[in-house]
Amino acid sequence: STPIKSSAASDVYKRQSLKRKGIEIRLNAYALSVYDTADGITLTYTDNSDNTPYFWEGDALLLATGRRPMTDGLNLHAAGIRTDTRGALIVNEHLQTTAPHIWAMGDVRGGALYDYLSLDDFRIITNRLFGNKKRKTDDRIPVPYVIFTDPPLAHIGMTEEEAVKRGYSLQVSRLPAAAIPRARTLQQIDGMMKAIVNAHTGRIIGCTLFCIDAPEVINLVSLAMKNDLHYSILRDFIFTHPSMSEGLNDLFKAF
C-alpha cells in the first residue's frame, strides 16, 4: 500500500476539524492490551515519550492492519512467477510477471491498492496485448488519492517537506475553505487548500485539498500536473459559480 502523505499545515486543519467533531487523536501511542467489558472494551496503551500507561474505554475497537494479496498456496513458483515478501506478484512497467506469458492486475500486483489503478491496469495490459504496446505504469505518475473523511482529504504529488528535501525552490499557497463561496453556501467551511509550485518553472509539484468536494477538485489538479501545465492555467480558468473548483483561482492567484 501507499503511505498517507501529509504536511504540518494540513495536519493542523485536520486535527482542528476532527476535534470539533469530538474525535481525539493520540500520537506516539503503543497498545499494550485490550479486553472486553460489560459496556464494550478497555484499551491499555503507553505514551512512547514517557512510557506512562493510559486506559481508554470504548464501545468497540477497530484494527487497521492493511491488506495483502492472498497468493499463498497457489504454487506460483511452479509457473515461474516470483512474489515479494508480502505475497504480491512482481511485475514490470507493463504489468508482466516473471513468467513472460502471464500478467497481473489489481491488488495482487501490490503497490498502491486503489480501484482506479486496477482499472488502469486493465488499460495497460489491453494495450500490451492488442494495442501499440507503449502504455506503462510510469505514465500514470503522479497518482492522486482520497480519504473519505468529513471533510475529505485529497492529495497528489509531493508534500512541502518532501519537495524541500529534494532541493526544489518552492512557492507555497494556502487557502482556507471558508474563503470559498461554495463552502459557505453548503455550510461546510472546515478545511483548506494547499498548493506547491516550482518557483523556476511554474509547474505544480503537489497539492493537498482538505475540504468539501476535494475528491472531485483534485482531478483538475491531477490533469494539470499530468499535462505539465503552468499553474496559471488553473489560476485563470473560468469555473462555474458557485463551485469548490473556483477555489483554485484564488489558491493559485497567490503566486
Q: Where does each model-flagged region fall?
A:
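Single conserved hydrophobic/aromatic residue that forms the stacking wall/gate
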Residues: 1-9, 13
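N-terminal glycine-rich dinucleotide-binding loop that anchors FAD/FMN and/or NAD(P) in oxidoreductases
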Residues: 10-29
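A conserved FAD-binding loop/helix module that cradles the flavin
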Residues: 105-162, 241-255
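Flexible, glycine-rich terminal cap/loop adjacent to redox cofactors
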Residues: 148-255
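A conserved short coil-to-beta-strand element within the FAD-binding core of flavoproteins
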Residues: 27-39
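Conserved beta-strand segments of alpha/beta enzyme cores
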Residues: 24, 55, 82, 169-171
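FAD-site-proximal beta/loop scaffold in flavoenzymes
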Residues: 55-132, 216
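Conserved beta-strand-loop-beta-strand element in the redox core of flavoprotein oxidoreductases
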Residues: 36-55, 61
